[in-house]
Structures are given as structure tokens and as C-alpha cells.
Amino acid sequence: INKHKKIKSTKNFFVTKNLKEIFLKTNTFIIIVLNEKQCEKIVNKFIEIKKNIKINKNHTIINCATVSPNWVEKIYKKLKKNNFEYIDCPVSGGPKKAISGNLSLILSSKKNIYKKNFALLKDIGNNIYNLGNKIGTGSTVKIINNCLAGIQILSAAEAIMLAKKEKINLKKIFKIINNSSGQSWMFADRGKRMIEKKYIKPLSRLSIFKKDMKLANN
């Protein structure tokens, strides 16, 4: 949550700092935070609340954070013991697509749980890729995607610097590459920003980039 931005409750959703209040109002929870540590803190709190209020019915956690498949397997076993269902559902697309509801969802889940939550998933993203019931596969594919994206950002920077060193017009280089075999989404988007030097509004954090590369390396 952006601490500097005050979000108010409306007729369509409510804002609260109390996880117990959320727990009593719904059976399905979407987690989208920075890392495994933050995810686990929320999961542990939900398990604790469930034990304290003694509710036996199943709840579903849809985890949209980018985490390692090993962590997913570990947390899934823990949740299963406490009557929670789990959808491994990392997302891709950044802030723009999040606002418009056009994220890509790369998920793995039990078939019945996927079907039960399909309408909700459809509200989050319009590109839903279901990789089957092996929990953790969604996170594996997301890490592969992020690995490729990271390499493309670095190679875009190298290509631009090489062109600059050789005193070649960068706008022309950009146009040529985007219409040639070196084209990529990252070059078209981030490469353009590098050339235009438009860094006023950052689109991602370096810490997230490093985290994603570390997950891929591991």
C-alpha cells in the first residue's frame, strides 16, 4: 500500500488495516506484495485468525506476487493443513495494465478451484494462462519470463551505448531495431525511454529487478 496515498472505502470495496475484518467478510484473498517474507507474514496471520475464530470452511488464497516455486510448494503444504486452497498466480504487465485490468495471469491451481474463481481472475487480467494443477508451475514460468525481460533490458542498454559510442543517430537505431530481428518489447518500451532520457516517472524499482534476477539465478 502506498502510505502517501489515502484510499477510501466505497460501495464496491472497503479499506481496512484489520486482517480479521477481511477474513470475516470474504472467503477469497488476493495477495500482491513485494516478496516471500511479506507473503508469509500475511499467510501466517490468516492461519492464526482462522484458528482463533475456529472456522472450518475452506478459504482460497490467490497469490499474485513473484516468488520462488520452492517457496510456493512449502507454503501450499502449510495452507493445505489449515483448510486453505491456493492459486499460484503471478502477474505480468506493470502498473498500466493493473489499472486497466489487462494483466497477464500465469497460474497453476486445482481445476475446481480455478473454475470457482475464474470470474474474479477475469476481473484482474484478460490474458489468463492456466498451466495445470501442479502448484508452483505458474511461479516457475513467471521467473523464466522475468529472466528474459531482465536480459533484454541489459542488452537494450548495451546496444544503445554501442550506437552512441559509434556516433550513430539513436532515433534511427531505435527505428531500425524495432523493424528488424533485434526487436523486443523491452527494447521498444524501455529502450525508447533510455534514448529519450525520460526518467521522471519510474516504471519499476531496481530492487524488484534484482530480486527477480536472483530468483532466476537460484
Q: Model-predicted segments: where are they?
A:
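Beta-strand segments within the central parallel beta-sheet cores of soluble alpha/beta enzyme folds
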Residues: L120, K171-N179
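Amphipathic alpha-helical segments within well-ordered protein domains
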Residues: A157-M161, F174, I195, K214-N217
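Active-site-proximal catalytic alpha-helix in oxidoreductases
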Residues: S100-L107, Y129, I135-E166, I176-D189
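Conserved SAM-binding strand-loop segment of SAM-dependent methyltransferases
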Residues: N12-N18
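Rossmann-fold dinucleotide-binding core
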Residues: T66-N146
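Interdomain hinge/lid region at the active-site interface
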Residues: S139, L148, W185-N218
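Rossmann-like NAD(P)(H) cofactor-binding subdomain of soluble oxidoreductases
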Residues: L19-L24, T28-I31, N35-L103
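NAD(P)-binding Rossmann-fold cofactor-contacting core
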Residues: I1-K11
